[in-house]
């Protein structure tokens, strides 16, 4: 048996194509789920017959995502098989102490370990990666050699701009008959699946990784017509992939919850005015790690925040103040949060805050443009969005009763645990 080692985990060499899918924002069905979960409701409504069939012959359960339950840390956990304390990506956005600047965490320079893709390419595997948003692309494709013709990595967002030297393929928009998708649409994810299926047909990757957008999930709850149609599209493509005798593994980077009141107004805890009751603004810095270029999705409002203080002596008073606030679930000193959530201590600040299920955390009213929110707010980032799907189209007997699964166990499950 041939194995590849990456970050102290051994992975069996695939004997058939392995397709791992991160369905961004795919809230699963479980007792505390929002609306019964996207996949589960779509199955109930007859929109996902292929995944319905997997319930009886594969693995169909849930797992825990990494906290914060955001896109970047969880995608990188999935593709490295490690938590953030190992790979270093603590959010979509952070305060870089070295440069004294607030920056997007999109640069591969922030990565502290290699990816499963790189480890397999080094041993001769063919790797294909398609992500919806370009913000992830460089990190997912970090250190891959595109010149040798055994790796492809591009985003649906910028598919028409790809080159062989940078992405392993020229003009990836030609892979399908679909028009170049709008980044603020479900079509962005449909393109990911369609192009992935084309690569399975024509390029024969050993490992195919698909990472979608959560635009639909931010706008539409489980079981709604738009959500069901979106998941029906996914089911159709999964069935086509099954025809290639592929191992298909599905998980998510985070769930998604409604964050608004009965009138549709967002439930927001603004942190700055609360802390200003104790400290002047130049004595603290609030970081909202959900922040990314796609504010139409969420308005930079999520369930997780970190706070940097000029004087560590202020930690306890600030923690006490925030802990008493409605809408806040946890307020932790950084050392405790890093141990509990396996976060890199140098990228977290002094205090970590998570919101309650129906609430989000904001900076101040002036900081957020709520006019970008065309529907009642749905978002993620906290503990209430940690549960995600964990689905395999082949049996995995050893995982059926496993008490603890993480979304970053999905490559281990697909490569090491599936049986015919």
Regions found by a protein language model. Give the residues of each.
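Active-site neighborhoods of enzymes that stabilize oxyanions during catalysis
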Residues: 289-419
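Short, structured active-site-proximal loop/turn typified by the sulfatase FGly-forming signature C/S-X-P-X-R
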Residues: 31-81, 128
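Acidic/histidine-rich catalytic neighborhood
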Residues: 239, 256-306
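Short catalytic/ligand-binding loop motif for oxyanion handling, primarily in non-cytosolic enzymes
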Residues: 28-30, 71, 87, 135-141, ...
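Anion (oxyanion) recognition and catalysis
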Residues: 55, 121, 242-243
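A short acidic-Thr-Gly-centered motif at the start of a beta-strand
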Residues: 1-15, 243
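His/Asp/Glu-rich, glycine-adjacent segments
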Residues: 81-221, 297, 303, 309, ...
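Metal-dependent active-site segment of extracytoplasmic phospho-/sulfohydrolases and closely related
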Residues: 20, 28, 50, 229-273, ...
